[in-house]
């Protein structure tokens, strides 16, 4: 996996947006470590076009207690100049297929949120998840501060049919 290309996609989200509440972009080596750690248990998918990495999505542990074993958290990042090309949708469709094959029943997305869009955050991620069939299930108010602004966090979930 091209950790360098994926870190280059992620870093601008950290440095210029409130989409992630991480405040310092990880090094390429740290990013590589995160990929390896995730892949021990969960899928990490990469979207490429003509050999160029355009985005990635992965599942992660929702909670560490065994009772949560049928749930996972989703994450997705698409290169900023590649939005609107269907990359996010394709990644999520594949991710959901892999989740179901793993026997997962719930996918949860933790999303930065603001009532009023600003230079650092819009509702694009919420709208994307709604289009993908996720529904809002929790809202935490003013729980994160970045770039001198308070931001909310919402959780959205996708529930697969119970087996």
Tell what function each PLM region has.
Residues 86:
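Glycine-rich phosphate-binding loop
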Residues 23-81, 92-93, 98, 102, ...:
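Acetyl-CoA-dependent GNAT
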Residues 122, 142-163:
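C-terminal "cap" of GNAT-fold acetyltransferases
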Residues 58-61, 110-112, 126, 130-149:
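Conserved catalytic-core motifs of GNAT/GCN5-like acyltransferases
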Residues 1-6:
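A short beta-loop-alpha structural element at the N-terminal edge
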Residues 8-25, 38:
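Helix-loop element at the rim of GNAT/NAT acetyltransferase active sites that forms part
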Residues 99-121:
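Conserved GNAT acetyl-CoA-binding A-motif
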Residues 75-83, 111-116:
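A short, internal acetyl-CoA/4′-phosphopantetheine-binding micro-motif in the GNAT/acyltransferase core
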């Amino acid at each position: 996996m091209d950790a360098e290309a994926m870190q280059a996609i992620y870093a601008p989200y950290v440095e210029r947006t409130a989409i992630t509440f991480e405040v310092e972009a990880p090094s390429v080596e740290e990013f590589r470590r995160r990929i390896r750690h995730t892949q021990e248990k969960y899928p990490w998918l990469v979207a490429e076009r003509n050999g160029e990495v355009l985005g990635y999505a992965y599942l992660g542990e929702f909670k560490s207690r065994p009772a949560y074993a049928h749930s996972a958290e989703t994450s997705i990042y698409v290169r900023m100049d590649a939005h609107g090309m269907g990359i996010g949708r394709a990644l999520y469709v594949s991710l959901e297929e892999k989740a179901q094959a793993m026997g997962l029943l719930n996918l949860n997305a933790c999303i930065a949120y603001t009532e009023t869009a600003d230079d650092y955050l819009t509702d694009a991620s919420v709208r994307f998840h709604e289009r993908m069939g996720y529904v809002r299930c929790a809202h935490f108010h003013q729980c994160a501060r970045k770039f001198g602004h308070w931001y909310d966090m919402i959780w959205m979930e996708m529930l697969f049919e119970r087996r």
